[in-house]
Amino acid sequence: MGNIKKWLPVISLTFSTFIFNTSEFIPIGLLTSIADDFAITESKAGLLITIYAWVVALASLPLMMAFAKTENKKLMLSLVALFTFSHILSGFSNSYVMLMISRIGVACSHAVFWSIVTPLAVHVAPEGHRSTALSMIITGSSIAMIVGLPLGRAVGLMVGWRVTFLLIAILSAIVLCLLAAFLPKVPSDNNISLKTLPALVTTPALLCIFVMTALTITGHFTAYSYIEPFLGQAAGFTNGEITMVLSAFGVIGIIVSVLFSKYYDRHQFAFLRVAVLGICICTLLLGISSGNSFIMVCTCLLWGLSINCFNISLQSCIIDYSPFGTAIAMSIYSGIYNVGIGAGALVGGIVCSHIGIPFVGYVGGAVSLISAMFFLLTVTSVLKHSKKS
């Protein structure tokens, strides 16, 4: 990878994606513990995921437009500082409302963070290593699934979920120091206004990406938001086995990152097909697989492969197909992604409350099937004819 000093900014950003991704999904692994502690239902605890996602969805574009001209290092440090403070508040939450408020603070930092981190990593990476920088950012997210989420869940089960949030606060403070030391100043290049925004949003390729993202992520999170109680109640897994399955999602993510850096440039549509069709198939198979532990684990591994392919491929597509204002386009993508998370968690909660946890996969799979059909019939042809020069 050449001189390690040239990679320190990207490495620091990779650590930041690890900590942000750990925080984003930590309530999924602690859903039962939080529900028991506050004497609420799991579906109500799931609102921590839903409202978080909706805040990100609603705030991403307005906040990114508001800070579009802010120098990137200054903006990144401010975001991580807010993130750290909000987790301290989470760790000392003595009520469900206080925890929700703290999570809204995290969501506001998240809203801008994911809009700038990928374009920033590409910008500060050594010349000619864009795919490697992108794969490193996704690797940070994947390691969060391997280490951060399962470890946070294990800590939460042993000494309480509040300690998990405080540990995240400590780690984010360390990340803040790394970014302050190694991230160079990067002037903003977002020359976009409210007048030019519609032209960006209505770009055919981006419009297809946004619609496909909303459908796919809604289907995915209808099931994934409740994967912990699903594996425990429907599949009969123990706490230790659930933690291992959650870790497997991240292990697969690292494999995808390596494959992406080597093969994506030549096989873009193969990655997209695996992503969209794989999510559809796996969510539909969840209910059927729950009766056999081996098949259940295999389904989850393929599911992890598919969602990681989706995440890394779609971020690359945003960069490739944005005619201008890449960070703004990424903020729209992030917002829509979180609409999908929120909608999925909400739909999954309704399914859990009125039909039963074993059925979240079938409902999520039905939504994912619509996305798969849209991809096969429309998205592929539009992307092939819209490649940005």
Language-model features, listed with the residues they occupy:
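Helix-breaking motifs and short loop linkers at transmembrane-helix boundaries and internal kinks
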Residues: 39, 71, 92-98, 109, ...
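Conserved MFS/SLC helix-loop-helix module at the cytosolic interface between two early adjacent transmembrane helices
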Residues: 58-94
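Helix-to-loop junctions at the C-terminal end of transmembrane segments
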Residues: 59-71, 256-268, 352
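Paired small-residue
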Residues: 86-89, 97-105, 294-302
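Helix-loop-helix hairpin linking two adjacent transmembrane segments in secondary transporters
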Residues: 98, 127-183, 226, 230
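Cytoplasmic helix-loop-helix junction between adjacent transmembrane helices
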Residues: 102-140
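C-terminal transmembrane helical hairpin of 12-TM major facilitator-type secondary transporters
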Residues: 270-314
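A late C-terminal transmembrane helix in Major Facilitator Superfamily
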Residues: 320-357, 363-364
